[in-house]
């Protein structure tokens, strides 16, 4: 589906499960070769799909809850800048590591106002500056990225 451009990224990362249970993975493959034990392989494979799907569903639910909490926080704390804050927040689900130029492009703000917006979002705990520099800084939506680490 990724090759046909229906999906941009795989929904399930089954190879992680296979790495985690590498020994059983190779044993099941060998059993198919040696004894034609397709049933054992299919049961193992389906357990992998079910396990990874459960983890993906939990991650998705967590992201939805966090997204709503952050939307509420920005509406309550950002005052007149809530609109631009929410526009930026939506863009961060597609680009969680970014620069001020990205903020300018998605909000239409000047560099100074985009910089102030990001500073305020860092202060409320939604964003994190990741370079430690004064110039050419980059920021991340760390709470979102934490779901994938």
Feature roles, as predicted:
Residues 81-82, 129-149:
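Short, cationic-aromatic polyanion-contact patches
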Residues 2, 93, 104, 122-125:
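Alpha-helix C-terminal capping/helix-coil junction sites
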Residues 58-89:
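Short alpha-helical segments that sit at the start of domains
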């Amino acid at each position: 589906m990724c090759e046909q451009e229906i999906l941009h990224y795989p929904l399930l990362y089954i190879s992680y499960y296979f790495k985690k249970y590498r020994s059983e993975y190779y044993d099941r493959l060998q059993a198919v070769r040696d004894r034609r034990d397709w049933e054992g392989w299919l049961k193992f494979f389906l357990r992998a799909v079910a396990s990874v799907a459960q983890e993906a569903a939990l991650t998705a639910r967590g992201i939805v809850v966090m997204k709503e909490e952050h939307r509420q926080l920005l509406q309550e704390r950002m005052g007149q800048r809530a609109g631009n804050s929410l526009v930026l927040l939506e863009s961060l689900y597609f680009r969680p590591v970014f620069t001020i130029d990205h903020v300018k492009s998605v909000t239409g703000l000047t560099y100074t106002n985009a910089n102030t917006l990001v500073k305020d979002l860092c202060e409320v705990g939604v964003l994190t500056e990741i370079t430690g520099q004064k110039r050419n800084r980059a920021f991340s939506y760390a709470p979102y990225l934490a779901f994938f680490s």
